[in-house]
Amino acid sequence: MSNETQFEKLLSDVRETLDIEVKETLDIAGDPNHRAALAKEIIALANHGGGFVIIGYEEKEDGDFVPSVNRKPSMMDWSTDKVQSIISRYVDPHMQCSVTQTSIPNSEDRCVIIAVPGGHKVPVRAKSGSPDN
């Protein structure tokens, strides 16, 4: 299955599962606690066997996810280099995640999908904590 097809499937029915984590927004450029929170999600997914972090959706009271109105208007912060620098700072052992910005179905808006690999030979752990810890 191509990445594009896989992303279309993920976004056709956004929900959290053991291998999918959904976040409304994270300020990874300006807030070190948000960078640490992203690293924590990546660690959990990596230890589970891999998965995806979807940025740009919020959970409604009924449990459904919809595109977030609070996400940053610019997705410029979400590059592979930026996410890899967070992984280098907080995650051990180092891993390579792919970061894709893609269109939200039936919308002109975009979201971010981070693909987290699984199958690590040793447990993935935090190299350092958030600044508040």
What are these model-predicted stretches?
Residues 1-133:
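Conserved N-terminal catalytic/coupling substructures associated with nucleotide/phosphate chemistry
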